[in-house]
Swiss-Prot record:
Keywords: Disulfide bond, Glycoprotein, Hydrolase, Immunity, Ion transport, Iron, Iron transport, Metal-binding, Osteogenesis, Protease, Repeat, Secreted, Serine protease, Signal, Transport. It comes from the Eukaryota. Hydrogencarbonate 1 binds at residues 136, 140, 142-143. Transferrins are iron binding transport proteins which can bind two Fe(3+) ions in association with the binding of an anion, usually bicarbonate. Fe(3+) 1 binds at residues 79, 111, 211, 272. The gene is LTF. SUPFAM superfamilies: Periplasmic binding protein-like II. One of its GO terms (biological process) is innate immune response in mucosa. Monomer. Found in a complex with LTF, CLU, EPPIN and SEMG1. Interacts with E.coli outer membrane protein C (OmpC). Found in a complex with MPO and LTF; interacts directly with CP, allows Fe(3+) incorporation into LTF and activation of CP ferroxidase activity. This is Lactotransferrin. Residues 44-51 are annotated as: Interaction with E.coli ompC. The lineage of its organism: Eukaryota, Metazoa, Chordata, Craniata, Vertebrata. Hydrogencarbonate 2 binds at residues 478, 482, 484-485. Fe(3+) 2 binds at residues 414, 452, 545, 614.
């Protein structure tokens, strides 16, 4: 692993200053074989003078979750299904390191859940009723959650409170599902090979437990189908001739060879992960232990002890035998982000009633950023008779994360955030189309979206300022990572100065979302009580287009980076708030890139760039339903809707631009631009990618890890 792991280990070692003395990681084990390996690991770590590891004996992974939560243990490696359970109340554990699979040249932090059958048996995935099945274990990803989620339409099951196990026991003629209560569901333990109390045990004491065990159940002829992962058959059968006796069952009810798992699988599943407490979890110490252990006992090391290996006759003790190593997981990633919405939806679908599943599919969960948006969203929800319901987060990135986890479905984003959301796998659904003199309300939904102009605004009286003399001036921004307020002007400035030190180029700023201690937040004011200073939501009075212009209008900043209509919307009586009611359009001018200045009304010939309109984003599986719901809502509450202004208006706000821009005429179709790259355009995407060298986004970094 010369190419891969030295770089991997050096990343993890940075910034780790914890003294190993008097500190120990208590690793949780679930069988005598794991306890034996853990004890050997403990002795080996002492020899190399690494961080101390001690071993805590439990009888199941679930007992380990409880022990870690109550601070009686510190770490254990879990399958994705148990990562989900561990992340719930009251445990609140989070994944801190992911197992890496694949090859040195193509390392992966995921695997594929597959269904395998012997060649010549001729049944398909939709013909499993009455057959015999082999599973890795109850509640595990590849062996239970994914296949049962896929088979739910075929099960005679209305959902809780009736146990899923009861429906599965009726569906298959016999099974081996380790970890099931064999007394209550004898049919689900009928095929298991353990003896006495070990029959159907939730550990390697049951010979058919885990991936290799479930495949052995198929090999031995006990079962007709095995639910395992893509690498299981390769690990169990090194010879291709032997593997050729088996086939994959595909979701489209065909079969493929076992090496075609990328085209024929039940789901893409995140790899097993080490979990720890989310508070006081010894995360740095655990990672320091794992770094040293990989360095000394990892894949390809000459030591007699192998961290990712098990003695003859044993499999997957403490870690998967197939793991190449471990990658540290960003602190931004909780269990929901790690697992992703598809996997979580599968799990929830197996725990909810049919009515609950249908309600969740029918509703749209809108994500509101901050308390002001939450209030507007709640009113929308009431007026829509719960067709739309609300989730809330304090920042736009946190809302994007909720959509990724399936805890929300959509929100409307500025182009800069569309870039981040797109990099995380979300897609645009509908675009905000603004009013213009040539607009026609009748064709707004189908009219191509024009985009808007990003501009730099100054007070007319401050006549010495030009685009070329901004160094040392005070600036007002909509928010970090937003298009007109940050990405476009900062991209141009970094290109001109070849520097990313914006806090040195500008004397002071209000750029919501920056470090509150930095000069980039020095001009921010927070709310009327002085709280929430520099937060990237409407609790910061200088946030957004209107807020950035207010920062300029109140003589706090010298220049405001906004869009072309911002000044028009807030002067000459258009905005009746106290701070804006006396502002005159003629008191402001635009800075042109050639060093001249022009009236605000001449933005067409004096702007920084053309920016893509805001757009609604969601997960790809929600696009069709979301578009249908939003167009229906728009017919009621849009600018010309039959219930606006009588009941509620989507495109009006008590404070400016909540949920959508107030000057939105309609939500328009995308004209075939269905990916973030197509919607934003190649020039904008390239510009953002270059600007990314100047700043980091925790969510972007998290998504880069998750999408690897």
């Amino acid at each position: 692993m010369k190419l891969f792991f030295p770089a991997l280990l050096s990343l993890g070692a940075l910034g780790l200053c914890l003294a190993a003395s008097k500190k120990s990681v208590r690793w949780c084990t679930t069988s005598p074989a794991e306890s034996s390996k853990c004890a050997q690991w403990q002795r080996r770590m002492k020899k190399v003078r690494g961080p101390s590891v001690t071993c805590v004996k439990k009888t199941s992974r679930f007992e380990c979750i409880q022990a870690i939560s109550t601070e009686k243990a510190d770490a254990v490696t879990l399958d994705g299904g148990l990562v989900y359970d561990a992340g719930l109340d009251p445990y609140k554990l989070r994944p801190i390191a992911a197992e890496v699979y694949g090859t040195e040249n193509n390392p992966q932090t995921h695997y594929y859940a597959v269904a395998i059958a012997k060649k010549g048996t001729n049944f398909q995935l939709n013909q499993l009723q009455g057959l015999k099945s082999c599973h890795t274990g109850l509640g595990r990803s590849a062996g239970w959650n994914i296949p049962m989620g896929l088979l739910r339409p075929f099960l005679d099951w209305t959902g809780p409170p009736e146990p899923l196990q009861k429906a599965v026991a009726k569906f298959f003629s016999a099974s081996c599902v380790p970890c099931v209560d064999g007394k209550e569901y004898p049919n689900l333990c009928q095929l298991c090979a353990g003896t006495g109390e070990n029959k159907c045990a939730c550990s390697s004491q049951e010979p058919y437990f885990g991936y290799s065990g479930a495949f052995k159940c198929l090999q031995d002829g006990a079962g007709d189908v095995a639910f395992v992962k893509d690498s299981t058959v390769f690990e169990s059968l090194p010879a291709k001739a032997d593997r050729d006796q088996y086939e994959l069952l595909c979701p489209n009810n065909t079969r493929k060879p076992v090496d075609a798992f990328q085209e024929c699988h039940l789901a893409r599943v995140p790899s097993h992960a080490v979990v720890a407490r989310s508070v006081n979890g010894k995360e740095d110490l655990i990672w320091k232990l794992l770094v040293k252990a990989q360095e000394k006992f990892g894949r390809g090391k000459p030591s007699g002890f192998q961290l990712f290996g098990s003695p003859a006759g044993q499999k997957d003790l403490l870690f998967k035998d197939s793991a190449l190593g471990l990658l540290r997981i960003s602190s931004k990633i909780d269990s929901g982000l790690y697992l992703g919405s598809n996997y979580i939806t599968a799990i929830r679908g197996l725990r909810e009633t049919a009515a609950e599943v249908e309600l969740r599919r029918a509703q749209v969960v809108w994500c509101a950023v901050g308390s002001d948006e939450q209030l507007k969203c709640q009113e929308w929800s009431r007026q829509s008779n719960q067709s739309v319901v609300c989730a809330t987060a304090s920042t736009t990135e946190d809302c994007i994360a909720l959509v990724l986890k399936g805890e929300a479905d959509a929100l409307s984003l500025d182009g800069g955030y569309i870039y981040i959301a797109g990099k995380c796998g979300l897609v645009p659904v509908l675009a905000e189309s603004q009013q213009s003199p040539e607009s026609s309300g009748l064709d707004c939904v189908h009219r191509p979206v024009k985009g808007y102009l990003a501009v730099a605004v100054v007070r007319k009286a401050n006549d010495k300022i030009t685009w070329n003399s901004l160094r040392g001036k005070k600036s007002c921004h909509t928010a970090v990572d937003r298009t007109a307020g940050w990405n476009i002007p900062m991209g141009l400035l970094s290109k001109n100065t070849d520097s990313c030190r914006f806090d040195e180029f500008l004397s002071q700023s209000c750029a919501p979302g920056s470090d509150p201690r930095s000069k980039l937040c020095a001009l921010c004011a927070g709310n009327e009580e002085g709280q929430n200073k520099c937060v990237p939501n409407s609790s910061e009075r200088y946030y957004g287009y209107t807020g950035a212009f207010r920062c300029l209008a109140e003589n706090v900043g010298d220049v405001a980076f906004v869009k072309d209509v911002t000044v028009l919307d807030n002067t000459d009586g258009k905005n009746t708030e106290q701070w804006a009611k006396d502002l005159k359009l003629g008191d402001f001018e635009l800075l042109c890139l050639n060093g001249t200045r022009k009236p605000v009304t001449e933005a067409e010939s004096c702007h920084l760039a053309v920016a893509p309109n805001h757009a609604v984003v969601s997960r790809i599986d929600k696009v069709a339903h979301l578009e249908q719901v939003l167009l229906r809502q728009q017919a009621h509450f849009g600018r010309n809707g039959r219930d606006c202004p009588g009941k509620f208006c989507l495109f009006q706000s008590k404070t400016k631009n909540l949920l959508f821009n107030d000057n939105t005429e309609c939500l328009a179709k995308l004209q075939g631009k269905t990916t973030y790259e197509e919607y934003l355009g190649p020039q904008y995407v390239t510009a953002i990618a270059k600007l990314r060298r100047c700043s980091t986004s925790p969510l972007l970094e998290a998504c880069a890890f998750l999408m690897r």
